[in-house]
Curated annotation (Swiss-Prot):
Superkingdom of the source species: Eukaryota
Gene label: MT-CYB
Localization per record: Mitochondrion inner membrane
Recorded family membership: Belongs to the cytochrome b family.
Protein name, per record: Cytochrome b
Species this protein is from: Crossoptilon crossoptilon (White-eared pheasant)
General function of this protein: Component of the ubiquinol-cytochrome c reductase complex (complex III or cytochrome b-c1 complex) that is part of the mitochondrial respiratory chain. The b-c1 complex mediates electron transfer from ubiquinol to cytochrome c. Contributes to the generation of a proton gradient across the mitochondrial membrane that is then used for ATP synthesis.
Annotated positions binding heme b b566: H98, H197
């Protein structure tokens, strides 16, 4: 029999082993769909971003009007812009659900895969941040000013670092130019790290909802999971297109319809919704350096999760106490997101402080303690 080109060709062989003949556990649920959805999000963002970059001008006097020009005069420019802006939101929705799945089912015990995933999250956050500055509206400018200014809290080198990042003494033309360069570059860096992420995952194979070895029962990725992923894609595409076509500005800030003005500060400076949980944690500490450290810790804490796993069972499937804590953590993050969008006044200050405290408490002490308790209860 003639050799199958899919299995013998050096390039096709890699694709085949990753997406076609890949042995996959027979019982992975829809929670395992988000990896492929994230890949689709990245591809969409790169494509729409490339088309937008063709019409964008990275200059303070032209940036705002170039975006307006794209929406008004370019064929389907409004659609490309709406898909790109709302695609970012769906990218974050998918990555949050993907991380939540990892926490619930103990996927973080594949340490290399988990760590590359955390690096991907950080790179994505950086990309989204620099991208938000590009339309050069009021919230773009002031959001960029406030967040970059946080680096000045670093002792001794802080102020120098901020001025170096800005390319001057305030957010101005050099800042916009370099942010555009970074925003163009970073998605390709994300694509590269994604390949590494996938490579580490395929070393061990996927985890499954039971958290036990699935070597005894594997099925080929195609047609089973390729079809399942297409269904997941259709289910994501529906709300995504509904949002982008019916209310494209729902998640945006009205302030961004006003061109950037360094002389007028908006009443409430806040980032996009997907950063609000971290922003709430930053604001809950009445000290600049402390707030910056808490902000960094709120994401970097994910790197500690594999070391805080004390249960003898991998997943939370059969651990009701840990499940309760997990959903408490989810509710807590939703509260933080809401508080981050509110002004800094009573009662939001105290709610934010309590939610920030419980966020770290649940992750650092309650989950490991409850894991140990469940071991005892099961006579492990």
């Amino acid at each position: 029999m003639a050799p199958n080109i899919r299995k013998s060709h050096p390039l096709l062989k890699m694709i085949n082993n990753s997406l076609i003949d890949l042995p996959a556990p027979s019982n992975i649920s829809a929670w395992w769909n988000f990896g492929s959805l994230l890949a689709v999000c990245l591809a969409t963002q790169i494509l729409t971003g490339l088309l937008l970059a063709m019409h964008y001008t990275a200059d303070t006097s032209l940036a705002f009007s170039s975006v307006a020009h794209t929406c008004r005069n370019v064929q389907y420019g409004w659609l490309i812009r709406n898909l790109h802006a709302n695609g970012a939101s769906f990218f974050f929705i998918c990555i949050f659900l993907h991380i939540g799945r990892g926490l619930y089912y103990g996927s973080y015990l594949y340490k290399e895969t988990w760590n590359t995933g955390v690096i991907l999250l950080l790179t994505l956050m950086a990309t989204a941040f620099v991208g938000y500055v590009l339309p050069w509206g009021q919230m773009s400018f002031w959001g960029g000013t406030v967040i970059t200014n946080l680096f000045s809290a670093i002792p001794y080198i802080g102020q120098t670092l901020v001025e170096w990042a800005w390319g001057g003494f305030s957010v101005d033309n050099p800042t916009l130019t370099r942010f555009f360069a970074l925003h163009f570059l970073l998605p390709f860096v994300i694509a590269g790290i994604t390949v590494t992420h996938l490579m580490f995952l395929h070393e061990s194979g996927s985890n499954n909802p039971l958290g036990i070895s699935s070597n005894s029962d594997k099925i080929p990725f195609h047609p089973y999971y390729s079809l399942k992923d297409i269904l997941g894609l259709a289910l994501m595409l529906t709300p995504f297109l509904t949002l982008a076509l019916f209310s494209p500005n729902l998640l945006g800030d009205p302030e961004n319809f006003t061109p950037a003005n360094p002389l007028v500060t908006p009443p409430h400076i806040k980032p996009e919704w997907y950063f609000l949980f971290a922003y709430a944690i930053l604001r809950s500490i009445p000290n600049k350096l402390g707030g910056v450290l808490a902000l960094a810790a709120s994401v970097l804490i994910l790197l500690l999760i594999p070391f805080l796993h004390k249960s003898k069972q991998r997943t939370m499937t059969f651990r009701p106490l840990s499940q309760a804590l997990f959903w408490l953590l989810v509710a807590n993050l939703l509260i933080l997101t809401w508080v981050g969008s509110q002004p800094v006044e009573h009662p939001f200050i105290i709610i934010g402080q309590m939610a920030s405290f419980s966020y770290f408490t649940i992750l650092l002490s309650l989950l490991p303690a409850v894991g140990t308790l469940e071991n005892k209860m099961l006579n492990y």
